[in-house]
Amino acid sequence: MRALSIANIEDKRYEYIPFEGEFAEAFGNRERGGIWIVYGKSGMGKTRFTLDLAKEFDRMGYSVLFATLEMGICSDFHGELSSAGIRSKVNSIKFVEELTLEDLERTLSKQRSPDVVFIDSIQYFTDQFEAKAEEIIRLRKKYRSKIFVFTSHVEGKEVEGKAAYLVKRDSFVRIHVEGFRAIYKGRSRGGRKGYYTVWEKGASEYWIENENQ
């Protein structure tokens, strides 16, 4: 154990994600690294939001790996890519349909490893590919500059399953997707607006209807 003095903490330098526009308005000044968890009910815009976020990281020059474990590269996912405006001549995001924790660790150990890893979903990663929450957290601590973005199903208002709950507790950024808005729920203050709109028309109809109830 190494104890830090106040001076040590004052001298520490941090690297931040240079978000602009809607992403900055939603999520503010986020430190690079750690676990992000994106959770919400089906049909609310989780997949589209994570693709928008992956596209934004790619635009900023981060190398991105997207593990579409749940949907695979099916026609629906192809449609989501098109809707998000992700195209081969513009974007360089890499996609995989299968990923074990051993695969991920091997990938991260390489010299040109991804800066950001998206895993859809935490339930598929733990149930189908036998990843453990403790191992995910260990990887987060080992690769501190890497960003891990997990999507999660919900049970009521909470993430579904013990593994997802443990990963959420360790997460630096929590984003609840409801009514086509990705709403910042992290530990510290988010952006001025506090949410990112995934689909303007759908969000407008959903929130007007809910406000009138």
Task: Set out the residue ranges of the language-model regions.
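Conserved catalytic network of the ASCE P-loop NTPase/AAA+ motor domain
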Residues: 29-30, 56-60, 88, 109-112, ...
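Pre-Walker A adenine-sensing motif
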Residues: 14-30
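Phosphate-binding/switch region of NTP-binding enzymes
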Residues: 142-213
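Short acidic, S/G/P-rich loop/turn micro-motifs used as interaction or catalytic elements
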Residues: 44, 72-73, 122-129, 155-158
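Conserved P-loop
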Residues: 32-103
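Charged, amphipathic alpha-helical linker segments immediately N-terminal to NTP-binding catalytic cores
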Residues: 1-13
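Phosphate-binding/switch loop-helix module in NTP-utilizing enzymes
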Residues: 95-151
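Helical mechanochemical/support elements of P-loop NTPase systems and associated helical scaffolds
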Residues: 73, 100, 132-135, 163, ...
